Amino acid sequence: IFPKTLQINEGEKLSVKIYKGFYVLKPKSGGSSVGVKIIKGQNSIPNKNEFKWKDLMAEEFVGSMELTVTVLKDKPLCVTEIKAAQNEEFYNYRAKYERNRSIHEIPAKIPKQSYEQAMSWALRAHKIVGCKGISRSDFRYDKINDQLYMLEINTQPGMTETSLSPEQALFCNISLSEMVKIIIEEASYEC
């Protein structure tokens, strides 16, 4: 299940296509939450001229928990809950790359069925997209309704000291050097 998402093309007014309530406005391309804004209804709609991107997506803001699953060599590793630090509105660029800007709870404390569903969906997305070596899929989880939503698959997940994939690998007793070796070996099979 995916959140309701609308495409907003260059020249279209944002106010014409928005959802009632909260939603996420983000560029169609890019990464690391660059250009992402949380919109809290009609009164907080930014001017489209504020964005350097031509095409945007308006995605319904769903769930209360942000989750992620790394798949390494066709095997999902674990589910991590990502929490932005108190001084961050959401898991934005700073929260991803600066120390002490986010908290990673590993493994995520969600019902077993939802945990297994996240692992299964991440593996399925990895295979459908044709990923080799590594991918990381992001989810939102609605605790009240016990509903998992898939947001996206990252085909080149971060590999910094604050990145989620190396942390998940380490949790599964896979060192960074071993993880990199697996990624290289998987890529070399395609050559």
Question: What is the predicted role of each segment?
Answer:
Residues 1-65:
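Active-site nucleotide/adenylate-binding loops and adjacent lid/helix of ATP-dependent enzymes
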Residues 8, 36-41, 71-73, 142, ...:
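Short beta-strand-to-turn element immediately C-terminal to the catalytic PLP-Schiff-base lysine
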Residues 18-20, 73-74, 143-148:
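A short, glycine/Asx- and small/polar-enriched loop/turn
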Residues 40-114, 148-149:
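Phosphate-binding site of ATP-dependent enzymes
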Residues 51-55, 97-144, 183-186:
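A long amphipathic alpha-helix within ATP-dependent nucleotide-binding catalytic cores
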Residues 60, 69, 126-159, 169:
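Conserved metal-phosphate-binding beta-hairpin within the catalytic cores
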Residues 147-191:
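C-terminal active-site "lid" helix and adjoining low-complexity regulatory extension at the edge
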